[in-house]
Amino acid sequence: MERTLVLIRHGQSEWNLKNLFTGWKDPGLTEKGRTEAIAAGKKLKETGLKFDIAYTSALQRAQKTAQNILEQMEQSDLELIKTPALNERNYGDLSGLNKDEVRQKWGEQQVQIWRRSYTIAPPNGESLRDTGARVWPYYLHHIQPHILRSQTVLIAAHGNSLRALIMALEGLNSEEIISQELATGIPIVYTFNSDSTISSKTIITP
């Protein structure tokens, strides 16, 4: 049996649609977001994968994405573990604000630093490094042991929590990871060798 991990960023949320900084705020999925999650579940079912356990954040947009995927895979009864360790990066004082209005107030350059710097956080928020400092230890302690037992694991989470995880999994540096974008609702499938190194990476496109 292969050691397999599937990562997926939640489908489009109501605040993605409104161009708002979301972070730890908890809007639901749009109809498009639900459609993205359902399509991802159908694609994953076509691969023949069966999950042994699933993880998601404490936020409903990720939870609903996971639930829609599991329904399509006829695994609705699978244990779904919810943890704030996998939450999106906390955008602090920017949370709930319109991104264009934030740029007008603080300037494009400052907003770009907050969004894409690895170490600099927005006021009262988290940097990507801060996000990784909670995501990676949780992965090592709770999730990786399942993979090392040749189980197949789903993580439905968020753009920045997944970027932090991918950075650690793939050994990327801060410059490499800040340039990576994760589309909503697109599964990334990793398989691993017995020493936890990556054997393969596949992006399942619609």
From Swiss-Prot:
Pfam families the record matches: His_Phos_1
Catalytic reaction annotation: (2R)-2-phosphoglycerate = (2R)-3-phosphoglycerate
Pathway: Carbohydrate degradation; glycolysis; pyruvate from D-glyceraldehyde 3-phosphate: step 3/5
Top-rank EC class of the record's enzyme: isomerase
Keywords: Gluconeogenesis, Glycolysis, Isomerase
Site (Transition state stabilizer): 158
Gene3D superfamilies (UniProt xref): Phosphoglycerate mutase-like (3.40.50.1240)
PROSITE patterns per record: PG_MUTASE
EC number per UniProt: 5.4.2.11
Disulfide bonds: none
An example molecular function term from Gene Ontology annotations: phosphoglycerate mutase activity
Signal peptide region: none
Residue sites binding substrate per the record: 9-16, 22-23, 61, 88-91, 99, 115-116, 159-160
Residues annotated as catalytic: 10 (tele-phosphohistidine intermediate), 88 (proton donor/acceptor)
Description of how the protein assembles with itself and partners: Homodimer.
NCBIfam families reported for this sequence: pgm_1, PRK01295.1
Protein family per UniProt: Belongs to the phosphoglycerate mutase family. BPG-dependent PGAM subfamily.
HAMAP family in alphabetical order: PGAM_GpmA
Protein name: 2,3-bisphosphoglycerate-dependent phosphoglycerate mutase
Species of the source: Bartonella henselae (strain ATCC 49882 / DSM 28221 / CCUG 30454 / Houston 1)
